[in-house]
Every structure is written in C-alpha cells, then in structure tokens.
Amino acid sequence: MRDPVDTYMNYLVPMVVEQTNRGERAYDIYSRLLKERIIFLTGPVEDGMSTLAVAQLLFLEAENPKKEISMYINSPGGVVTSGLAIYDTMQFIRPAVSTLCIGQAASMGSLLLTAGEKGLRFALPNARIMVHQPSGGFQGQVTDIMLHAQEILSLKKRLNEIYVKHTGQPIEKIEDALERDNFMTANAAQEFGLIDTVIDKRPSDEPAKA
C-alpha cells in the first residue's frame, strides 16, 4: 500500500524531467523554477516558509549577484516577524527582486509585494491586495499584557514606515488605509503605489522563464 503522505506530496508537487549530457534528470517543479531564479511565496507566512524563502534568496545571490530574482506571491499573510525576515533579506541582497501577485497578497503578503524593486512590482488583473494593521492577542499578568501591547504598537509604527518608504504615500494616508482591513483590486493597488504595473500577458519579447 502506498504511503498516503507520498501520494499527497506527489500529487501537489509535479516532477519534470530534463535531458542532459549525462542522461535524464528529474526535478520537482519548484526546484526547476528556482533554476530560472523564480521563488514562490504561497500560503501563510510563518517561520518555516520564511526560512525557505530566505535560503533561496541567499542561494540565488551567491549564484549570481547581478541577475534579477522573480518572486511570485499568493499569500494571506501571517506572522509579522517571519515576514520581516523575508523583507530584510530582500533589501539586503544585491540582486534586484521583482514581485508579482497571483491570487492574493494580504497583510504581510502585501508588504512583501510592495518591497520589490521599484518598477518591478506587478500584479495580475484579478489579484486582490489587502493591507491592515497588525493584530495579536495575549493573556497573563497586566504588566505582561502592557508589554505586548507596546510591542504591537511598535511593530505597527515600523510597518507603517515601510509602506511609506515603498509606496511614496504620506504617513497619514498609510495610517488611515491600514486602520481596518482594506481590500484593493490590482488597479487600486497600482494607484496607491503598492505595485507599479498591472499585467495580463507576458511581453512577447520576454523569455518565458521569468
């Protein structure tokens, strides 16, 4: 009987086979796309996903520090500190990182989308982008609750500053936009400055690898 975990993973992650001068070589689809300098950020932003994304960014920088990296984002958001680890690495490495929203980029997903290289931040026409302030909960002694509240306020301030930096919007407009869940179409996100371009087709002169 086949292992149900193996069946599940094989169903979700297709394998591709390439012919090389040494014979056939099989890759899972994401490893093959990584060869083309494409990184996928899909699902909730948490420590495991963040670690993989950071590792891929660092690997691609070491492989070629001058060649652009493409990041495809479809994420509902997640843990702020995990997202900031990816954000800081995107800013730290030498290659330009282009970002493309497919599906959705919500919460920390939207921050990573707008953190791409200026002029290289894209969304497909039916993508949805959502921004809001950080949220969290804590129970315990009053002093501990106050400390955690101060930390969330500090994170809120820092996230607002990042959005200001990448969108060019004044802090007052960012604070107002992030006060509640703020859903945007791709065109609205472009007007707001979260992305640079809404694209519906790959340019005919652009190779299909990126």
From Swiss-Prot:
Protein family (similarity comment): Belongs to the peptidase S14 family.
Subunit structure: Fourteen ClpP subunits assemble into 2 heptameric rings which stack back to back to give a disk-like structure with a central cavity, resembling the structure of eukaryotic proteasomes.
InterPro entries per the UniProt record, alphabetical: ClpP, ClpP/crotonase-like_dom_sf, ClpP/TepA, ClpP_His_AS, ClpP_Ser_AS
Any one Gene Ontology BP term: protein quality control for misfolded or incompletely synthesized proteins
Keyword Hydrolase annotated: yes
GO cellular component: cytoplasm; endopeptidase Clp complex
UniProt superkingdom: Bacteria
Pfam families linked: CLP_protease (PF00574)
Organism field: Azorhizobium caulinodans (strain ATCC 43989 / DSM 5975 / JCM 20966 / LMG 6465 / NBRC 14845 / NCIMB 13405 / ORS 571)
Coiled coil region boundaries: none
Active site, renumbered: 107, 132
Xref: PANTHER family: ATP-DEPENDENT CLP PROTEASE PROTEOLYTIC SUBUNIT
Major localization listed first in the record, in broad terms: cytoplasm
Function: Cleaves peptides in various proteins in a process that requires ATP hydrolysis. Has a chymotrypsin-like activity. Plays a major role in the degradation of misfolded proteins.
Gene this protein is translated from: clpP
Protein name, per record: ATP-dependent Clp protease proteolytic subunit
EC number in record: 3.4.21.92
